[in-house]
């Protein structure tokens, strides 16, 4: 354990209910105004791996789906950005799109399982790129995989070719690309979209990195790997999404919050509160799971036993929604608690 982490732990104990960073109160005010540029306020040499980053699971479903099954978000990508979401789980598959009379071409399109969203991958990237152009102090993370459940559009070689071409085209501008390194800093990431792909579309990533060793087990894994062109990092990962054990899911979420807080710089963490209870991801089962887990993590981050360190990337369902029917989802409160955690302890700085 380094001296910087010892300092963080000691300072956190002294200021449990008061933000260490003076701009934390400003951040809360910005959120209420719908313009939450919280990354802009962080020091350039802070390690990105130790940040607390709110993210959305199957982010594009909030822009609309062809039917409600598998809809995990209520807000559009733009609305998610406005509330401070900076990590986006996107699932591009592909489909044929009409380009003229009797002319069709394959195009990357976002799905959740067999459910088609109303958003193309190009459109989703454009939303993020436009926001970064307007807010160059921010950055975004895309966590993606090949969603290949369609019986018609499931050929891996087609997807590989489409993705390789897209990530090197003008649709993914060169100024948004960045190669992954474990020790990336906030300053290096400003204005960029870091792409972490769970499926390798080429021998080496065109931008960002590939992720291997993904796990859906209740206990998660501390041995997944993020591999960039020239460097790799350990990934601590919890994505227990088909929740047969409510208490086990909550315990795993809180365990990975602690693991993230105690990790050395360069170790990354992705922690999902998302998922569903029961046997199928229906609207009700997704919201019940969100209520169970979002409240638990919110209470943990705002309570007296909160971890004295970053949470890593937290992916949740129904961001921005406080309640829906009988469910208290805390989709508004949890992302802000994650954001505020960046200002609750001294960040470890590269070179210091």
Segments predicted by a language model, with ranges:
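C-terminal motif of bacterial Sec signal peptides marking the signal peptidase cleavage site
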Residues: 8-11
